[in-house]
Amino acid sequence: MKVILTKDVEGWGTIGDIIDVKRGFARNYLIPKGFALEATESHIKHVQEILKQKARKLEREKAKAEEIAKQLEGLEIEIKKSVGTTGKLFGSVTTSDIAEVLKEKGIEVEKKKIMLRNPIKNIGSYNITIRLHPQVSATIKVHVTPENI
């Protein structure tokens, strides 16, 4: 029986693939679970339309990410924190702090898109990568300075 996949099914294929499976597997598992539809002309057109919509959405998201990346590229921000006598920060600079400063500058970035392995705990300048889209990223410079200067 030929079916068209509506979701990615490990070992069988991805969305939009037309595969040939045993009738029982299709009727008892793939179709009831929403993984596939019988490969009729109308179902094929329906799934192809869904794929086109997803492609357009991904293209819009990429264009928006590229626009934000242009604003971010080369941007330098300063974050002031309380510092002890050894030059270590009381607390640390996290992705939330960076996202907040960017928001104040009018650039909305989700904190999970800021690639910071570990919180910053020392004074200095750091290059931080922001991954806006799987294919689009930008680098900003973050200057961490003492609050009392």
From Swiss-Prot:
Gene3D superfamilies: Ribosomal protein L9, C-terminal domain, Ribosomal protein L9, N-terminal domain. One of its GO terms (molecular function) is structural constituent of ribosome. The keyword Ribonucleoprotein applies. Pfam families: Ribosomal_L9_C, Ribosomal_L9_N. One of its GO terms (biological process) is translation. InterPro entries: Ribosomal_bL9, Ribosomal_bL9/RNase_H1_N, Ribosomal_bL9_bac/chp, Ribosomal_bL9_C, Ribosomal_bL9_C_sf, Ribosomal_bL9_N, Ribosomal_bL9_N_sf. One of its GO terms (cellular component) is ribonucleoprotein complex. Keywords: Ribonucleoprotein, Ribosomal protein, RNA-binding, rRNA-binding. It comes from the Bacteria. Belongs to the bacterial ribosomal protein bL9 family. Binds to the 23S rRNA. This is Large ribosomal subunit protein bL9.
